[in-house]
């Protein structure tokens, strides 16, 4: 899969002194070893893993991680989810709350597109308002596709999320009341 213009194509095997800067240089052998170590660890401990793509923003790397056993990929923004989906990634979780209706409509369209390819999109929420706005965007999409919803738990930093316990349960129940939203778990 090629997603870059010819001038920006990967230069695998190129001598470092011939590479124009700025450039990302990756030791492919070390990357493969690290991916395999993480996959082996997850299998040994019987855990599902979903790496974050906020640093590499690479569909190719996300697909390699999924081939090694990652459940999917995490991103911070709708635009990052759209870019990875365009590169072939089909299981994406947006780990930040999305509140603006234009972005929620984009997320709803993306959820529909991913569902049509056997994929799924998830979004984090930490308020009843966020759930209602997400449900509204999904309803307005005109699609029967659903969206996974993760209730974000505040881990004590006071940045985002709801306290554990009753507030989290209340949000999970609020998600369950909407036909196109699926409670997919907690995020902390």
Annotate each language-model stretch with its function.
Residues 52-188:
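Active-site-proximal beta-alpha core segment in soluble small-molecule metabolic enzymes
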Residues 19-21, 46, 118-120:
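Short, solvent-exposed beta-strand edge segments and adjacent coil->beta transition regions
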Residues 7-11, 30-61, 74-76:
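N-terminal glycine-rich anion-binding loops that anchor highly charged ligand groups
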């Amino acid at each position: 899969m090629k997603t870059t213009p010819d001038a920006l194509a990967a230069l695998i095997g190129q001598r470092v002194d011939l590479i124009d800067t700025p450039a990302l240089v990756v030791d492919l052998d070390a990357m493969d070893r690290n991916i395999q170590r993480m996959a082996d660890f997850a299998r040994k401990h019987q855990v599902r893993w979903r790496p974050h793509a906020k640093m590499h923003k690479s569909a190719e790397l996300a697909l390699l991680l999924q081939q090694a056993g990652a459940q999917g990929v995490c991103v911070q923004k709708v635009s990052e989810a759209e870019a990875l989906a365009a590169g072939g990634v089909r299981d994406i979780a947006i780990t930040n709350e999305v509140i603006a209706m234009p972005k929620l409509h984009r997320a709803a369209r993306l959820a529909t597109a991913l569902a049509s390819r056997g994929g799924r999109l998830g979004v984090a929420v930490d308020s009843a308002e966020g759930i209602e706005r997400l449900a509204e965007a999904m309803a307005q999409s005109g699609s029967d596709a659903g969206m996974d919803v993760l209730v974000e738990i505040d881990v004590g930093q006071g940045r985002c999320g709801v306290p554990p316990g009753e507030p989290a349960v209340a949000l999970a129940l609020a998600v369950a009341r909407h036909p196109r939203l699926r409670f997919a778990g907690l995020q902390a």
